[in-house]
């Protein structure tokens, strides 16, 4: 992840595969670790973070959400976007809130084949490690 207060600094961890279901008959060991730009959309406050606004997405992925997953978007984001005022959709994940609430954002991702042969295997939910947010907050606290 990157945070606004530390532009260009990345907080990284090994990427585990999304938790989900395959649409093909292959072993779970074929799942590639979480990858792609979907996390940008979700950490902004859309995608899985706004799953309660999308009946089809909720129907397909809702059972994969962690406990309290439907509330995660509203809990971890910081402000209602003016264009989404009628929906009261808030955006912008706050690292400090992730740490204080002991929650990580949720990201909806396709599950890809780690051998690159079968392409998309299915879909699922990924949560970045909470330690990334703790590390980011600690680094922010060291700024002058």
Regions found by a protein language model. Give the residues of each.
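Anaerobic metallocofactor- and corrinoid-dependent redox/one-carbon enzyme cores
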Residues: 1-144
């Amino acid at each position: 992840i990157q945070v606004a207060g530390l532009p260009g600094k990345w907080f990284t961890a090994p990427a585990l595969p999304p938790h989900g279901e395959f649409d093909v008959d292959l072993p779970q060991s074929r799942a590639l670790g979480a990858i792609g730009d979907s996390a940008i959309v979700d950490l902004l406050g859309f995608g899985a973070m706004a799953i309660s606004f999308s009946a089809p997405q909720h129907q397909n992925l809702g059972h994969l959400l962690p406990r309290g997953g439907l509330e995660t978007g509203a809990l971890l984001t910081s402000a209602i976007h003016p264009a989404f005022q009628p929906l009261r959709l808030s955006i912008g994940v706050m690292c400090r809130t992730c740490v204080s609430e002991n929650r990580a954002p949720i990201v909806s991702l396709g599950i890809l084949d780690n051998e690159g042969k079968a392409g998309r295997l299915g879909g699922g939910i990924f949560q970045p490690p909470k330690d990334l947010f703790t590390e980011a907050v600690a680094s922010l606290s060291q700024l002058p």
